[in-house]
Amino acid sequence: MNLDEYVRSLRGEVMGHHHGGPGRYEQKFKAFPISFLPKEKHSLESGGKILLPPSALNALSRLNIQYPMLFEISNPISGKKSHCGVLEFIAEEGICYLPLWMMQNLQLKEGEFIDIKNATLAKGTFVKIQPRTSNFIDISNPKAVLENSLRKFATLTKDDEIMIDYNNTKYYLKVVELKPANAISIIEADVSVDFAPPMDSKEATSPSTSSPGSHVSGPSKGLTFGPASTSAKPIPGGKKKKDESDSDSDSDDEPKFKAFAGTGARLDGKVGTPLGTSPKTLNTNNNNNNNNNNNNNNNNNNNNNSNNNNTKNEDTKFKSFSGKGHSLKD
C-alpha cells in the first residue's frame, strides 16, 4: 500500500471529528515531515508553519475562525505541546506536514497521530533566545538574521528549539523566555529580541550565583562583572618597578635647574652660600663634636672678650680729680 492509498483509507477515520464545540476546531491528523514533499517545498523546514488539507480550510471557514489562524498541536502519546500557523491548505486529506524540528520537539515519528485545534494567542512583546552553539553569535549581525528569519514563524512557544537556515547553515535556537505568556503570536507584533549565552559557552555551563563577590552573567554575550582581582596586572604608570625607583633616586643627585642659584654678595665682604643649595649632611657624631668644640671655643672667646672689655672699660672709665695735684705752699 502506497502513501496515497493509505491516506484514502484514513479519510473515513479522521473526517467528521473536527468539531470540538461551537466555534472550536479540533481534529486528528497523520504527521509527516516537510521532506516528504517535492524539493521546492523543502525551504519550509526553516519556518514555523504547517500544511493542512483543503477540508480543514472548509471547516475553519464554517466556524468563522478569523485570521491569523493559529493552532495548538500536541502529541497524545508524549503529552508534548507546541503552537504554529498554517501556510497552505494543499496537503492530502488526513495528512499534516510539519517542519522536522517541530516533530522533534513533539517527539513525533512519521505517520503518528497529532491533535490540532485552533488557538488564540496574545501578541508577543519580548523573546529571549539561546543559540545551541556559539557559531550563531559569530555571524556579523545575528539579531538582524534572527528578526528576518522569524518572519517565517507565526508563533513561538517557550522551551521549543526552533531551526533557521542562513547561508546554507542550520542554526538551532532555544526559546528561553517569552512575554507576556509562554506562547505568543508574532504576527504584526513589535517584539524585542534578546540573547542568552550559547549552550556551548562557558557562561552557560558555569554555575552563577548572586552572592557578593561572585560573577554575575549578564544578557546578550555573557559580560561579566565582578570585583577586581587582587592578582590583576598593575595599571601602566600606577606603580613603579624597583629599577625605575632606583633610577629616579639616582636622578635626584643629578644637577637640576634652580632659580637664583648664583653666588650672593654680602655687605661685610664675606662669601655667601648660594641660594637654593644646602650643605651636605655630615656624620652626626662629628657634627656633635664640632658643635661642642665650637661651643667651648665660643665660651672661651666670650670669657676673654669679657675680660678684655673689663680692662678696657676700667682704663677708659672717667675718673674725677685724677690729675696731678699742686700744693699752695709751693
UniProtKB/Swiss-Prot annotation:
Residues 206-222, 283-310 have a biased composition (Low complexity). Residues 198-330 are annotated as: Disordered. It comes from Dictyostelium discoideum (Social amoeba). One of its GO terms (biological process) is ubiquitin-dependent protein catabolic process. Belongs to the UFD1 family. Functions at a post-ubiquitation step in the ubiquitin fusion degradation (UFD) pathway. It comes from the Eukaryota. InterPro entries: Ufd1-like, Ufd1-like_Nn, UFD1_N1, UFD1_N2. The lineage of its organism: Eukaryota, Amoebozoa, Evosea, Eumycetozoa, Dictyostelia. Pfam families: UFD1_N1 (PF03152), UFD1_N2 (PF24842). One of its GO terms (cellular component) is VCP-NPL4-UFD1 AAA ATPase complex. One of its GO terms (molecular function) is polyubiquitin modification-dependent protein binding. Keywords: Ubl conjugation pathway. This is Ubiquitin fusion degradation protein 1 homolog.
